[in-house]
Amino acid sequence: MRRLQCGRPEERRPPAAPPMVRFVLLAAAAGGLLWAAAAEPDSPMTTSTPATGPSSPLSIQQLQTLMDKLRPLYARLGEPEPGDWLYHHKEPGQTFRQYVASDPVRPVGKRTVIYIQPLGEFTDAQRRIVTLTAEFLGLYFNRPVKVRDDVPLSVIPARARRTHPTWGDKQILTGYVLDEVLRPRLPEDAAACLALTASDLWPGPGWNFVFGQASLTDRVGVWSIYRNGDPSGGEADFRLCLLRTLKTAAHEMGHMFSMLHCTAYECCMCGSNHRQEADRRPVALCPECMAKVCWATGANPAQRLKRLAAFCQAHGLEAQQRFYEKALAILK
């Protein structure tokens, strides 16, 4: 299994390179055991977002032409500072054409639905974040989304938990969630299944925490709301938590469709090594990564931007709304 993540390694030593690639939004490492026993999928509680059916899938060249129009709108990545993701993790990046040539995981055949798997308990405000994130992912990836019935944290055994030795945070092991909770429960029509938890995440030895982690090949991922702030603290706090959660969810879902970290532009698919770096990343995809999503899902770029702008307007994400509207105006 190939995995990606973003996250915070322990300060005392660099993490040993594991035998697989991983991906997460803010802290990460892989690990985990394979579970051979299969289980019947749980019947999901569906809060569906219908697919935003495109007029017609665009060709690679048509997408390339449209994305070239958008390039002036996006900031190129500068030299990373000490502590930033790319300062510590040298990554090659991935162009749109490299992505197409890689035979990526994408929604094909009967595998067309994105599933959100709540893991553990949530407050009412956190539950609303889950619902809005499901709606956003449907618009972002042009897929119907179903939210499944909750799975309790009691499914995580003691060997896949720890208390952080310095901070005291209670954490669950991401590899166990991917391999032993999600993979055996993967529905037959799942384009991807992404677990969301209010628990802190930990990917294994050498790492302090991760915001999320996903498999590049197995259609499963997990991300956490734990470090995104308290959404019940007021409207501004709710919007901040929502935006952070949307970024992580979109980033991890991108990995589940075989998208690597972006190294060219300020982009939702950039790796992040700490909270400040994650907060300065946009929720929007750069031209290269947007082309990947539109090609993989059959989304019409202009329709996608219009729907995302409307979502941001409805939920008070004004800066994000303005950006999507600027991009839409260029394509028109």
Can you name each region flagged by the protein language model?
Residues F122, L201-W202, C294:
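Surface-exposed, flexible loop/turn segments at secondary-structure boundaries
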Residues R183-E252, M256:
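Active-site-proximal segment of zinc-dependent metalloprotease catalytic domains
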Residues G53-Y74, G221-R239, L243-R244, H261-K332:
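Metalloprotease/metallohydrolase-associated module, dominated by Zn2+-dependent proteases
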Residues M1-G7, E11-T52:
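Low-complexity, Gly/Pro
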Residues A37-L186, A190-A192, L196, R304-K332:
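N-terminal low-structure segments adjacent to metalloprotease catalytic domains
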Residues A125-R127, G204-P205, R280, T297:
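Generic domain-boundary/flexible-linker signal
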Residues K110, P187-E188, L216-T217, T263, ...:
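A short, structural micro-pattern
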